[in-house]
Amino acid sequence: MPSFPVCPLMSAPLLSLALVLVPVLALPTAQAADMPTTPVENARIDDFAVGKKAIEAKNWALAASSFSKVVAKNPQNADAYNLLGYSNRWLGKYDEAFAAYNKALALDPRHKGALEYSGMGYLKVGQKAQAEAQLAKLQAICAQCEETTDLAKAIAAYKPAR
């Protein structure tokens, strides 16, 4: 059997140490994708910032693309799912919008933005009862919040399409 030269740096103890350290050093990165984020952390995410600017410019396609990238990298980011839903709602992609809102609410059932925006979406598709259900959840969380009053006003002004 042929013999191969052994690199002196790859001794058994060093190799064992490397096999232990590599997964340990990679752990914070792997865990980061599974952790929820805060507004401050979101502001540091390039695609999140691009998405927010796109929303301000009413560039819904760019916003949806940007927030899709955020949730691909951090599937626990309820804020990004909410804004992905918001962007898709403005694009008229209601199924995609509701899927994103539902994901945001699965991650954070008290997400006021997702409750409000999904309620607005339900009005857009003529499902007033579902919008009222979202309003009831908002009222239980924060009766005087802007999200609650905005959705209540939209429901009060709602007229079904003819």
Residue ranges and their predicted role:
Residues 42-73:
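Alpha-helical segment of the N-proximal tetratricopeptide repeat
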Residues 44, 78-79, 112-113, 145-146:
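Helix-start (N-cap) detector for alpha-helical repeat units in TPR-like alpha-solenoids
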Residues 69-70, 103-104, 137-138:
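Canonical positions in the second alpha-helix
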Residues 83, 117, 151-154:
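Canonical tetratricopeptide repeat
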